Amino acid sequence: MVFHYRSILKYQVFRAYFHRQYEQVRIHTGGSQLLTCDCQNYSSRLNQSLPNEFKLDVDSPLPSKVPSYKKHALVLSLQNKSADELEWMTNWQSKLELNPMWPYSIIGDLKTHLKHTKFGSDVLVNAISIHSGNLSAPSRDPHERAHIFVIPDMKLYKISPQDVVSFAHFLGGGHTRQVADHQLSFADFLKGADNVVNKTELVSEPSNADHAFPHEDCKRDWILVCGHNQRDRRCGILGKELINEISAKGLDKDKNVALISHVGGHKFAGNLILYNYVGTNEKTGENQLDSLWFSRVLPPNLGTLLEHVDAKKIPQEYYRGGTSMN
């Protein structure tokens, strides 16, 4: 059975068509009692160490929705100060977009300037801490450019503070501004003052705008594990343990693996985003990827989940939603 997912995002119903054909399956069936038991035992042990308001929710149905977006900008965290002082633990404050330190300050700046672009609402911005793969964390040099990996561009851009505004305009498909002398039409009058939509016009960006920003191509799959510890302790604990499990089981072969800041659904931790790189569209030259979001991923079921996805099967029990990109 080919799986096409229906969900409600931005108050609209949409159907996600993937570049690959996935089969929807259930893995917690009669033959997988051991896996079910291992997951229950793990959740129970973790919940015993957490206060009541921060326990994992193991009973409620998973929300069947993910953000609607076209691009994902991932700001790479700096190198760890030491093995005991992890950057994502110490410097990912709860509201990371308010962090004034470079390069994290670029997160809030990008979000602000993306509001004034054509497609800015379709761009997600997060921080990531690289664990393994073919990308390296930037140095702690205060003059270092911010390293930003953009999906589905599959490019690592290196952005200086003075380039932030133009880079945001590039990400968002061009700068927009309100028409200053907009005259109310009779149709506007009938709508009422509170319902008039401000008209905007697009300030054209050069078609080769990306050439102005130093970048490297990197076309491979990604595993992103939510580990925003200062936002929610559950993700901090599970993020670290899932990353350790990926390393211990060798699940990172030919993939980039990283911890990612807040992606929602903390009570359903652990949360994963998988970006499966499919290839390049022969007609458009654009990169094609499938974006798959999962929750309730624990060390006991992590390997089984990734094996199923590699076999083009989506486990219902953990699936939140997804879509194709490009």
Curated annotation (Swiss-Prot):
Pfam families: Suc_Fer-like
InterPro entries: Aim32/Apd1-like, Thioredoxin-like_sf
Sequence similarity: Belongs to the AIM32 family.
Protein name: Altered inheritance of mitochondria protein 32
Species name: Zygosaccharomyces rouxii (strain ATCC 2623 / CBS 732 / NBRC 1130 / NCYC 568 / NRRL Y-229)
